[in-house]
Amino acid sequence: MSEAVPTSARKSKNAPVAPGPAPVLEIESLDMEARGVGRTVTEDGTPGKVIFVEGALPGERVTYSSYRRKPSYEQATVVDILRPSVLRTQPKCAFFGTCGGCSMQHLDMRAQVAIKQRVLEDNLWHLAKLRAETVFAPIHGPSWGYRYRARLTVRNVAKKGGVLVGFHEKKSSYVADMTSCEVLPPHVSAMLVPLRRLVEGLSIRDRMPQIELAVGSQVTALVLRVLEPINADDEALLRAFADEHKVQFWLQPKGPDTVTPFYPLDVPLDYTLPEFGIRMPFKPTDFTQVNHQINRVLVGRALRLLAPSRDDRVLDLFCGIGNFTLPLARLSREVMGIEGSDTLTTRALANARENGVDGHTTFACRNLFEVTGDDLRALGAFDKFLIDPPREGALAVSKALAEIAQSGEGPLPKRIVYVSCNPSTLARDAGLLVHEAGYRLKGAGVVNMFPNTSHVESIALFERG
């Protein structure tokens, strides 16, 4: 809220008001959304409001314009950079700053990884009073062309000259007018404009709100969300586009369970884990990692940390389609995968059979957000756990392990590898595992699964004894 202006100082309502100079701010750090963070200083020299400035980097001196004001903080955008950071780089994408797909292209990649590591360490310390005994070397790979999964929004916008296909604009429901994308694989980026033209020619151009993208090892799948049936002319256009661009179309008339392949029908969608001789078939609506190259390294790192042997019984929680379960089955006596989705559980079992490891695997569908100590006891003894939860984390699992440890009734795994996509829920769960279940945080490090974004993926190792 702006301050009241004394009556004597008020101008005529018709008189022009010259804007004052933009305020100046020293940027001290970045927050979880890749915004520069600084603090104003009051007239008496005491700290004032915290200012979150989009587009600013640590060490920079900037002027800014606030678009949201609260009593203790403001949100703002950069007006001018008076002293640039040595870590500032030229964004590769012409649409950076407008498109909401990326938030850190203006920051050197090594600095991006270092900042994500600091975010991980800060969360562990501030939320759980923990420091890892070892900081793992970051897992990183290609910075561009890595995004093998994406949800593209489709809008027929007359003011923009036709159909738009792309990510949302930053902090907006509008679709970015983008004709290429540096984080999508090059062949997908090159398809954005042809996709516009394709949709413009369809009878349901106003009834197709999104296209789901999933790139496999042999084919790129495009799932069209269709709110009305397509006609014969539409079918012909889709087939011609698929043949020209070597893609596979799927149609989704309602929920995810209604997704069916349209054309071509004979090309399998899969990804591979060559280190373990695994080929992983999946449907384009299944959860798979966005970055295939990083996923391969991550699976290898996780298994080396877990160090399974032929005598070990391993529990893989939130197993999905078997991304960790199947490689673990190559090295363990037995692996049990538990997943909350019936569909993914069925897919994991089929993938185990496909790869010839069904003799070493079992799968079950359970709600892991409501699991108890008694539920874990009923599963029997496991030597090691691998936990790979969604952003909500594994709170119920962590509480169940703490309950078993404090009761002294029931076996506990001697080692846990926890793969996280949210540092705050990892820190929360780590606090339970260490302070209440008796584990040590042996190591933790970041996984740069999403370069040029503020998303922080990480991996942590816990041991008892």
Curated annotation (Swiss-Prot):
Gene Ontology BP terms: rRNA base methylation
Pfam families: tRNA_U5-meth_tr
Segments passing through the bilayer: none
Active site: C421
Top class in the EC scheme: transferase
HAMAP family noted in UniProt: 23SrRNA_methyltr_RlmD
Gene name in the database record: rlmD
GO molecular function terms listed in the Swiss-Prot or TrEMBL record: 4 iron, 4 sulfur cluster binding; iron ion binding; RNA binding; rRNA (uridine-C5-)-methyltransferase activity
Top-level lineage group: Bacteria
Reaction catalysed by this enzyme: uridine(1939) in 23S rRNA + S-adenosyl-L-methionine = 5-methyluridine(1939) in 23S rRNA + S-adenosyl-L-homocysteine + H(+)
Function noted in UniProt: Catalyzes the formation of 5-methyl-uridine at position 1939 (m5U1939) in 23S rRNA.
Classification via InterPro entries: 23S_rRNA_MeTrfase_RlmD (IPR001566), NA-bd_OB-fold (IPR012340), SAM-dependent_MTases_sf (IPR029063), TRAM_dom (IPR002792), U5_MeTrfase_fam (IPR010280)
Domain TRAM: 16-80
Residues where [4Fe-4S] cluster binds: C93, C99, C102, C181
Organism classification: Bacteria, Pseudomonadati, Pseudomonadota, Betaproteobacteria, Burkholderiales
Protein name in the entry: 23S rRNA (uracil(1939)-C(5))-methyltransferase RlmD
EC assignment: 2.1.1.190
Chain sites annotated for binding S-adenosyl-L-methionine: Q289, F318, N323, E339, N367, D388
Record Gene3D superfamilies: 2.40.50.1070, Nucleic acid-binding proteins, Vaccinia Virus protein VP39
UniProtKB keywords: 4Fe-4S, Iron, Iron-sulfur, Metal-binding, Methyltransferase, rRNA processing, S-adenosyl-L-methionine, Transferase
4Fe-4S is among the record's keywords: yes
Region annotation (Disordered) ranges: 1-22
Recorded family membership: Belongs to the class I-like SAM-binding methyltransferase superfamily. RNA M5U methyltransferase family. RlmD subfamily.
